[in-house]
Amino acid sequence: MPVRPPLLHHHDGTPFRDLNHNGTMEPYEDPRLPVEDRVADLLARMTLEEKAGLMCHGRMLPPADGTPPADGALSADGASGAPGGPGGGPGTGTPSTLPTDAEHIAARHINHFALMAVPPPAAMARWNNHVQDLAAATRLGIPVTLSSDPRHGFTANPATAHSGEGFSAGPEPIGLAATDDPGLVREFAAATAAELRAVGIRLALHPMADLATEPRWARISGTFGEDADRAGRMLDAYIRGMQGDRLDGTSVACMVKHFPGHGPQALGEDAHFAAGRAQAFPGRNLAHHLRPFEAAFAAGAAQVMPCYAIPSGTGLAEVGAGYNRDVVTGLLRERYGFDGVVCTDFNALTGMEIPGLATLPARAWGVEHLSVPERLVTMLDAGVDQLGGETCPELIVAAVRSGAVGEERIDASVRRVLRDKFRLGLFEDPYVDPERAAPLVGTPRTRRLGRTVQRRSLVGLSGSAEPFTTARRTKPGSPADTGNPADPGNPADPGNLTDPGNLTDPGNPADPENLAVYAENIAPAALARYGRTVATPEEADVAVLRLAAPYEHREGLLERHFHSGSLEFPAEEAARLRAVCAAVPTAISVFLDRPAVLAPLTGPAGPALLIGDFGADDDLVLDAVFGGVPLEGVLPFDLPSSMRAVAESREDVPFDTAAPLWRCGHRAPAGEGAQERFAPHL
């Protein structure tokens, strides 16, 4: 097993980590020196192979228990005798679905890894320390940077976001925008960062600065909505919450994406797939999509990821943004003066082989005709610094040795990458405490905060909670509702007794056993606080339904996780929902990961109460329905009236669908809150 380098002391008493194992404090090991001086010293010591490894940002799948393998080897799929991945999972022993290489760190000099899964906090902390020990045993001891897509929401998509794993859940980023409260967003982002730091994750592959101007696009839940000004405010708060006011040892660095704006996808198709290779700018509105990035740069975003797609119709080169010198050098470097790390979106260069399941092509949109070495040279000429998802430093070495790329160009990128490692304090201490990790992740305070953000993001679209609160009051029985039970997701947490997001009506005298509720997609334990479950609407006093926004099911290992296509409920489903509403007073909450067409749920045939949510626990939705808790959220995009209106709108222009049912910025009336009836803009 690797031996952790000891903490030594310089002759003047300065403590340092002896990363190159020579017993002397070299300038790059000296914590007193300016970052730029340390970077220059380390860069001068590196071989071309070591530099090339630093420019690869691979993937990693830790074992489920975080236990290092007996031989000390590292595999990029979490080997320790138990590979796994999509369809298997870490530690399951199923066939690996990610490429393995026990020498990624030691031989290939790769020391950036995006985590494809995260084991429980203590296990993840142990794994981080094992990885850092492996890095410390290399010639120069350059520490590893572990990164991750979002892990604090409700979406589970292996290519874009994750949920669970013990982290405190808030709504999706679109729900953060729905709170319209930058102070609350910054507080939640800071809590998120603290949990990530506790397990060793120091680079966030988020936030998204893209605008939700094309309603069909599958990635809208990861954005801050359609309004560029609101998105800018949210980005400022989120980045400052994650990083602080400057990048240092208390920060989680943010990689803002997908420059210069991924929202205007042609026909709403996502650029992970060939159908979404191009964007559309019929409104010539690129400048509008740059505005949220300007806010991110002003907030100090450390890194940037360009999008896969071709910015067609903008006057920029007709190649994907990661290959596009007009985008990376012209816009990002020269116009905006950005000198941080630019990392390509993942597997834009070589694609990905998933043994036994699928081969995912490179998202090399616009340069498919080029060979892989030619693509690499094009990327480097464009100005990128790291290759997302790639573990092929030999291609970079070959490009330099062939004369296609100068080593000074490689040095410029390595300098940026090293700078962030030093600023994050990784050279001083990349380790975390496994015994403290579990108590620091998912604390009562951060869970309460996450639930508060969830509650604040709920948007009242139409109707009133009055039929449901009345039904509770008029059912005879004993007072069984205690008003503030503990969070059902963390029943041992007494701190949740004060959760302001879990309020009910403490004066309600009804016995839950006497209120018959027909429910769909709601946990029975949460519903038991308010009523007993019945099997059909006809048996019920009231009905409460939680629905996903409509989408078209797609085939394919990854594409099935992307909600794309039509935003309308199929006719049969719309008729079924209206039949439930006709049978009994009904509340419907729709998870708006995209701007759904909710026309069938409006008017007299619709529900008594219609809510838009962006990821919220069942009991919080039920509190809004039964408890009279105000619906405070602000709609972060227009909700269109029809798919025809969507098809006729321009992908790059906000608020462009004709006669939307609800406008961006809609909020349920104040005053009586959920008791007051309100309606769409018909």
Region locations from a protein language model:
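Short acidic, glycine-rich surface-loop motifs adjacent to enzyme active sites
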Residues: 104-122, 213, 293-321, 540-564
